[in-house]
Amino acid sequence: MGIYCNFSRCVAAERLLKRITKETVMEALEAILTRRCVRSFDPARIPSEDLVEKIAEAGTFAPSGMGRQAGLIIKLYNREYRDRFAALNAQIMGREDDPFYGAPLLFIVFADKRQATYLYDGALVMGNMMLAAHALGLGSCWVHRAREIFASDEGKKFMQDNGIEDFYEGIGFLALGYLAGEPRQATPRKAGFIREVR
């Protein structure tokens, strides 16, 4: 059986394994089991750039088909863009309230549609960032309709103005911020969620 990593990668993997303890494993599982979508943010509390960068970095380490890293993460601080995307999103939904739930900051995840697994790759980027946000004490919510918005003339102009190539497709918006109020309880898991074949 061959070893499919060069020396530096093997050393890095060995060091990582030494840092993994029972406590860190339990913390990771706890983050997965206690994360909730947040639909009420405190708009006055803006996450620090350090926290935002850690969350974005977690997204870059999401699995991807053949390791091709199809995802692209945009950290959106611009309030004018944020509010315009909120208006477009609400229009598509046929609603008038803020689809970003008052979140002061957005991530936008795109993925390279030339890659066969781009939808899955983009979804995994979103998932990694949601877990990282929760682990760092922040709330997040995946908001859909990025595909529709960035297929529109206005969305295409945003992409062009900000150097985002046209082979990228919108996967999702990630509303990010501090919770306003208490986190909600998890909905009970559905019966038959897990099945077994032997």
Predicted features along the sequence, with ranges:
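Leucine-biased recognition of intrinsically disordered, low-complexity hydrophobic segments
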Residues: 16-17
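Acidic, surface-exposed loops and disordered segments
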Residues: 3-10, 20-198
